[in-house]
């Protein structure tokens, strides 16, 4: 009766869709079946944290993902919040329960050899557009900046004497990114071609043929078009080049803290995922090369 009254509450008072109500009911039913199988009975008013933990383990053993398990726990939390409000229970058995952590997918990136081949073999075309498009790909790879940071770059943000770019990241936080001689040459070339081809233009560093600032979809599609030449890539966005920058830096012995600053991450935990990515690559090489792997 308690489960039915909870589902009716969701259905008639919260106006949840029938599909959602049935999903809540199925989640509670799964716990009920587990309790009956393990202990021969199920009483919602007597459920304790130990039972919930055992159920979580059984779900993970059966191949449920962390996301699925956490969704089921969310259903149970709603059920016991309802029972607390109704005065049926005095303690929530899930109060000390923490669901399994979702595994973050490793970032998609290009190997250095793949990146070199892409840049060496791609014909970006002649004139202003070809010069600009090549520089965009090169700058993403050389600096690791975000798409929004690249299109937000103004002429005044480029300091050639110090070889520094001033970029504005998330929450308007500014940081300085150094650049090398190869990128500097490409930038000089682009500026000369740009200024001659489009004398009247905005203050933006990267511009369209009409002189206006680039927009996100234009740059996204440009990057996607060029990354499509790498058959092994599943994702083909500007962020792949950001991932490639970070992974390349770490593979060449850059300090994790330095890479964090260059990427503009607030927490080093965010940057650590690239260290995991490089480690996964090492494991792959080991398995392919070692006779005992």
Residue positions per predicted region:
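Conserved catalytic core of the tyrosine transesterase superfamily
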Residues: 1-293
């Amino acid at each position: 009766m308690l489960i039915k009254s909870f589902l009716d509450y969701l259905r008639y008072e919260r106006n949840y869709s029938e599909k959602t109500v049935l999903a809540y009911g199925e989640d509670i039913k799964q716990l009920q079946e587990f309790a009956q199988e393990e202990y021969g009975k199920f009483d919602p008013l007597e459920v304790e944290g130990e039972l919930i933990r055992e159920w979580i383990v059984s779900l993970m053993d059966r191949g449920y993902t962390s996301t699925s398990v956490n969704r089921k726990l969310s259903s149970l939390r709603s059920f016991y919040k309802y029972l607390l409000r109704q005065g049926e229970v005095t303690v929530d058995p899930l109060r000390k329960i923490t669901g399994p952590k979702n595994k973050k997918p490793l970032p998609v990136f290009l190997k250095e050899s793949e990146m070199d081949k892409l840049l060496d073999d791609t014909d970006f075309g002649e004139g202003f557009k070809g010069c600009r498009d090549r520089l965009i790909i090169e700058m993403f790879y050389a600096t690791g900046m975000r798409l929004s940071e690249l299109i937000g770059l103004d002429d005044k943000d480029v300091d050639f004497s110090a070889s520094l770019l001033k970029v504005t990241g998330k929450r308007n936080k500014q940081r300085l990114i150094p650049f090398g001689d190869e990128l500097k040459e490409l930038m000089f070339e682009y500026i000369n071609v740009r200024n001659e081809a489009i004398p009247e233009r905005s203050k933006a560093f990267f511009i369209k043929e009409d002189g206006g600032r680039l927009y996100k979809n234009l740059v996204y599609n440009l990057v996607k078009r060029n990354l499509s030449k790498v058959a092994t890539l599943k994702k083909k966005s500007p962020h792949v080049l950001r991932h490639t920058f970070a992974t390349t830096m770490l593979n060449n012995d850059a300090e994790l803290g330095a890479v964090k600053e260059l990427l503009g991450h607030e927490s080093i935990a965010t940057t650590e995922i690239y260290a995991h990515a490089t480690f996964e690559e090492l494991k792959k090489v080991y398995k392919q090369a070692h006779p005992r792997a």
